[in-house]
Amino acid sequence: MITGIKKLLQQADRIIWGPWLIFLLLGTGCYLMLSLRFLPLKNLPAALRRVFLPESRKGTEGRGVSSFSSLTTELAATIGTGNIVGVATAMVLGGPGALFWMLLSGIIGLSTKLVESTLCVRYRVKNQKGEPAGGPMYVLQNAFPQKTAGRILAMLFAAFAVLASFGMGNMTQGNSIAEALSVTFQVKQTVTGIALSLLTILVILGGIGTIAKVTEYLVPCMAVFYLFGTGMVIFTHFKNLPAGVVQILWGAFCPEAMTGGAAGTMLAVENGIVHSGRMAMHYGVSRGVFSNEAGLGAAGISAAA
């Protein structure tokens, strides 16, 4: 049964994450970035200053969570497993060149996340408690010209979002934590799973307000720890940095890798694994979306709150 499920998931991965979706994500991001005249990049310093002002931490009654809490809620999904496990798997499967495409998808994805967040704020509504609620499902339902089609698409998005929350939203993180604790401290994976479930339930039952309060204190600590850890790795391996950059650029732009050939776009063999420019792009962009969530619509849900 496990083998059958694995084959089914692999087949779905080949169909969904085909070349068409890779170019659709990058193409949409490039189109929006050019249409906005690089607004996400030009206004990034001003946006950061505004978010970290003292006023940004104060929520207004009836207007949802504060700007800073909204930011930390979104960052909670992007700092962590996606930037650690996602990067590692991208390199193993796609080679060093995958890191370039992960970085590029993150930069281009700024425009995608800006537009989806703006739309979600524009079409958000008030729930029964008088609190703002929004997301792509509300955009599809209220902004789509054909109302019936809009409602159907909204329901489909909500259903797929729930399914995604079990996979990339929970299982990947839970498995990474359980595996790390099991290997390092010999903690049983079942115990870790139960503890994570209980802690998650306590936070979720409080609604978006409780989630925002938890992330407001937790995410800054995560960010500092993550940046400190990556900084230490770079510092201790600084002499290998130039060679690493060369490998990343070569893996992403090697002409032989991008044009392909009888060898199936072979670039290099590392530890018995054949890497190619096409594989680097595929795994770099797909793991990049897992990390930055640009195009998934999740950013708009927290922004609308």
Where are these regions (language model features)?
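Hydrophobic alpha-helical transmembrane segments of multi-pass small-molecule transporters/permeases
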Residues: 11, 15, 26-33, 70-74, ...
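Membrane-embedded translocation segments of transport machinery
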Residues: 213-216, 222-292, 296-299, 304
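Membrane-interface loop-to-helix entry segments
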Residues: 24-28, 35-48, 157, 174-181, ...
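N-terminal alpha-helical transmembrane segments of multi-pass membrane transport
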Residues: 1-81, 91-98, 109
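Alpha-helical membrane segments and immediately flanking helix-loop junctions
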Residues: 59-93, 119-137, 141-143, 159-162, ...
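Membrane helical hairpin/interfacial module
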Residues: 88, 95-108, 115-116
